[in-house]
Amino acid sequence: MAAQVIPELQSLNLKTEGGALPQELAPSGAPENEDGDSEDDNGDDQGADESRTIEVLAAKKKKKKKPKKKKKDTQKAQTEPPRVILSALFPNNEYPVGELVEYKDENAYRTTNEEKRYLDRMNNDFLSEYRYAAEVHKQVRQYAQKTIKPGQTLTEIAEGIEDSVRALTGHDGLTEGDNLLGGIAFPTGVNLNNCAAHYSPNAGNKMVLQYEDVMKVDFGVHMNGRIVDSAFTIAFDPVYDNLLAAVKDATNTGIREAGIDVRMSDIGAAIQEAMESYEVEIKGTTYPVKAIRNLNGHTIGQFEIHGGKNGKSVPIVKGGDQSKMEEGEVYAIETFGSTGRGYVRDDMETSHYAKVPDAPNVPLRLSSAKNLLNVITKNFGTLPFCRRYLDRLRQDKYLLGLNNLVANGLVDAYPPLCDIKGSYTAQFEHTILLRPNIKEVISRGDDY
């Protein structure tokens, strides 16, 4: 803000060039110099005139109002819980940059190559949308990490996160098509203990978070379909610290190894080596931390959380996929560790669903299925949704129609994925952008 200049009083020139007062300041009826007046008299009269003139000017200056000071621009701060739309906190539309990691080895030239830097500058809208979504994610999760406590229901936790995302993006998702502009990218996962992924409470769920629980919190934010997918694990009992440390280390290893032309199998091998170097002691028994071999990271496409039909997977164990990462791709680098078998299966009640991209045109006989497909298309497109989101849109008695859409291959169901009962699982995840000249960990924050 430009400094406000308060004008100083200027020195007054009280005489004209001839030595007389300016006419407009001369007292009315003052006699001009006459012959015979003594020099002293002239001096006395002139001094009196000057005194009166100064008094007149001083009176005028007293009446003159000082210019009002401009109010200082005050930077808005986020509330608790987060409810201030992000654009109000960043009125210039310049959002924080993620962690920048230079490419290494044979790709090191990309950091200084002018052509690559030029290509990178072409992506301003793309980067702005991603950074907006990432900053929303960071602000929401940092508040969640401070306030999630034992005794809360899983529904309270999930809806608290979702309400904050809607407020900060400015999209409550209640108007048709609003959620496609920005907001929640997929249902909030609140996965306990042996359940690793895809669990979100349905209506009526009374499950309560306990002190002994290990909870994976996985949620997404999008702006114009640019999805930021990031997850963390909460445990109140320090006995699980090594489990969390193993998975966090593995995720950071995957991020470090990822890059243009890097083979997926090499990333998976590095992740597994990092994670399985840890063990955890629980109630007197020591468990090796195992990478969950049938869970993977993945590419992210616009409005497509798993990258669509050309999507790629990032393994978290050695062997397998020999394909390479490519310039311009977006990845969710996520790793899962377990004290169990290191393998998950479908279990419990399904909450997550998503419309199948480019699904064939299937004639639907159930009117409830037709109507529901129309609601899903207009409000979520190919973004995943859960049954609570249909409840918010005042849909009722939709389960028969939803199951019919799944049976006809128009909607995919994603049941919760769980290891053996009694085991504990952990997850950490970040979204990375493989920009032409640098790698940006878009969701990196001070927390993880």
Swiss-Prot record:
Relay the cofactor remark from the entry: Binds 2 divalent metal cations per subunit. Has a high-affinity and a low affinity metal-binding site. The true nature of the physiological cofactor is under debate. The enzyme is active with cobalt, zinc, manganese or divalent iron ions. Most likely, methionine aminopeptidases function as mononuclear Fe(2+)-metalloproteases under physiological conditions, and the catalytically relevant metal-binding site has been assigned to the histidine-containing high-affinity site.
Cofactors = Co(2+); Zn(2+); Mn(2+); Fe(2+)
Predominant place of localization: cytoplasm
Q: Which residues fall in a coiled-coil region?
A: none
- Record's subcellular location: Cytoplasm
Q: Where is the composition biased (Basic residues)?
A: 59-73
- Residues annotated as region Disordered? 1-83
Q: What UniProt keywords apply to this chain's record, in alphabetical order?
A: Aminopeptidase, Cytoplasm, Hydrolase, Metal-binding, Protease
List GO molecular-function terms, semicolon-separated: initiator methionyl aminopeptidase activity; metal ion binding; metalloaminopeptidase activity
Acidic residues: bias regions: 32-48
The protein's matches in InterPro entries, at most eight in alphabetical order, are given as:
Creatinase/aminopeptidase-like (IPR036005), Met_Aminopeptidase_Type2 (IPR050247), Pept_M24 (IPR000994), Pept_M24_MAP (IPR001714), Pept_M24A_MAP2 (IPR002468), Pept_M24A_MAP2_BS (IPR018349), WH-like_DNA-bd_sf (IPR036388), WH_DNA-bd_sf (IPR036390)
Listed under GO cellular component are: cytoplasm
Q: Which reaction is recorded as catalysed by this protein?
A: Release of N-terminal amino acids, preferentially methionine, from peptides and arylamides
At the top of the EC hierarchy, this enzyme's class is: hydrolase
Q: What is this protein called?
A: Methionine aminopeptidase 2-1
Which species is listed as the source? Ajellomyces capsulatus (strain G186AR / H82 / ATCC MYA-2454 / RMSCC 2432)
